[in-house]
Design a protein with these regions (language model features):
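Serine-esterase "nucleophile elbow" of acetyl-processing enzymes
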Residues: 1-53, 65-72
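Oxyanion-hole/transition-state-stabilizing segment in secreted/luminal serine hydrolases
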Residues: 15-19, 43, 57-94, 121
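Short glycine-enriched, charge-decorated loop/helix-capping segments at active-site entrances
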Residues: 19-25, 90-93, 128-131, 167-168
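Charged helix-capping and loop-helix junction motifs
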Residues: 92-100, 130-137
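Conserved catalytic region of serine esterases and O-acyltransferases that act on ester linkages
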Residues: 146, 176, 180-257
Length: 257
């Protein structure tokens, strides 16, 4: 199927955090990068990105899905549910039912749907929700199979297990992490690309340290992460505030690149 228009839906992952633009404010991210790769093969491609950081699945389906349908795009990407699973009451089974309904709604509107699973992040704190993410991913794979949708399985992308793929907050990808996801999306969508997302990361330079020193350095990094990133996130949850409050989509109209 030729793709002449593409709308990206979701949260901070699809908005593009932490992949800052070099030429202007805001973020690039995998979706922008994928759209550029797609446009190189499909001149005149129109693209919109309705994703906003902090959004939970219900907000994505209620606020973004109807707007996407109104644009009548050929392709819609849907990556959502991660913010729900970070919450203690996040239920992967209930989320999957909601996700399936959104996919069916998009398909009935004539859109092709590109689904993303959740990541297998291996940092100590996020490991606490690993089981919930795994269960949710099983549902997402079943949804993709049931509706014959293309699926980008982020969990199986071993190259993203490397800390180099993740920014300091351990929740968002680095620019090269986003680039690799865009390349994987191209592969799933049969879009030729010159690079390979499996390419090994550059070898880390530095002086080798003893296991004890390495352990201490890792714990210092964990403490700094808790102070700089985890504590503010918890404080926002207590106040009922989202990082996306007051922020609109970065590319709300379906326009040529």
């Amino acid at each position: 199927m030729a793709v002449g228009s593409f709308v990206a839906l979701g949260d901070s992952f699809t908005e593009g955090l932490d992949d800052p633009r070099a030429d202007q404010a805001g973020y690039l991210g995998w979706a922008d990068r994928f759209a550029e790769m797609l446009a190189a093969r499909q001149p005149g491609l129109r693209y919109a990105n309705l994703a906003v950081r902090g959004k939970v699945l219900r907000q994505v389906t209620e606020e973004q899905v109807p707007r996407a349908i109104a644009m009548a795009p050929d392709l819609v990407s849907l990556a959502a549910g991660g913010n729900d699973l970070l919450r203690p009451r996040g239920d992967p089974d209930a989320l999957a039912e909601h996700f399936d309904e959104a996919v069916r709604t998009l398909l009935m509107a004539g859109c092709q749907v590109l689904i993303f699973t959740g990541f297998d992040t291996r940092f100590p704190v996020l490991r606490l929700i690993r089981g919930k993410v795994a269960a949710y991913n099983m549902h997402l794979r079943a949804i993709a199979d049931r509706h014959q949708c293309r699926l980008v399985d982020l969990w199986s992308m071993g190259v993203l297990y490397d800390p180099c793929a993740w920014s300091a907050d351990r929740l968002h990808l680095t620019p090269d992490g986003h680039r690799r996801v865009a390349l994987r999306a191209c592969e799933v969508m049969d879009v030729p690309s010159a690079a390979d997302w499996r390419e090994p990361w550059p070898a880390a330079a530095g002086i080798a340290s003893s296991p004890a020193r390495a352990w201490l350095a890792a714990r210092r990094t964990d403490l700094r992460w808790a102070r700089v990133h985890a504590a503010p996130w918890v404080a926002r949850r207590v106040r009922g505030v989202s990082s996306g409050d007051g922020i609109g989509p970065k590319r709300p109209e379906l326009l040529p690149l």
